[in-house]
């Protein structure tokens, strides 16, 4: 049995949520939510249909000592939501840059979850980067609004491959600079 470890990834609190490292016990809810095509289609990496073992492998990678990405569960227990509402992540691009990613389960859409946690993590800047990037698919304007409302500036159009769609999808790229 593999023990759970937390390698200097902080547990932090927003007004309504606890952002914490993944636990193996999160597997069922993460798998349930990511099997939803509406979630998978708005990410680059979640396949649809979700193959057996994918969530367990994802959790294993997130708990690895040599990971390049910090992933937090958006835990909604203190707001009487689910223990897993979604995920938010920061991937180290280099020593001065990171890329923000997130998804929220459809049951919690339009409740301010993404806005609250994106603002919190981007303001906290836990990797102490000079710049933080984020990209959203152009058919997801709600996520674009979240980013602009949280202080990110639009910088360009691009494309990213979406595993669930099995195609390249137009994106908008955003940047937040720190002093």
What are these regions (language model features)?
Residues 1-37, 75-179:
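Acyl-donor (CoA/ACP) binding surface of acyl/acetyltransferases
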